Amino acid sequence: RDLTAATIARLNAIGIGRNDRVAIVLPNGPEMAAAFIAIGAGATTAPLNPAYRADEFNFYLTDLKAKALVVQKGVATEARDVAAKLGVAVLELVPGEHAGSFTLEGGSAAQAAQPGAAEAGDIALVLHTSGTTARPKIVPLSQANICASARHIGATLALSPADACLNIMPLFHIHGLIAAVLSSLGAGGAVICTPGFD
């Protein structure tokens, strides 16, 4: 909760609030899971595949009308340069001492239009369709949508505080974010987020 409160305050201090879209380009792991939750508690998250090329980042950041991009400090990504060219604020996630802890650096002081914690009707997450039959389209999911999905998955799997989920799924995709991370945490369980499956 401290991480979430600190993240919301940091975002609000640089003009990012509820329903403002924040693209997240981070490797799979505890920091990505924690960033999704903490940023989503006060803004709209838009996780993107870290393996995208510059032209793909250009499309997604433009289509999203992203207000900021979160990348991990010291990790190379073409997203940084693309965001700078588009005038999108680049925030660097600095991992903390413990798994999943972090701080955000960067951005300029500004007033958030809708500061504070997200409400049930606010958009928590935006994803794009696959684009197999047409140009990818944005799919917005509200706080209430993703919480209901996580609760239903947790109930279906009979998850409890005694459970631990080993997540190997990408955390820029709905299944990893909701079916693994949020459903487990929502049930009081634990999540171990690996860098991926090899």
For each feature predicted by the language model, list its residue ranges.
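Conserved AMP-binding/adenylation subdomain of ANL enzymes
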Residues: 40-41, 147-164, 174-198
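Conserved pre-ATP/AMP-binding loop-to-beta segment of ANL
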Residues: 97, 109-128, 134-135, 143, ...
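Conserved AMP-binding/adenylate-forming
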Residues: 7-52
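Conserved structural elements of the adenylate-forming
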Residues: 1-9, 120, 139-160, 168, ...
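Conserved coil-to-alpha-helix start sites within the AMP-binding
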Residues: 26-37, 51-55, 168-186
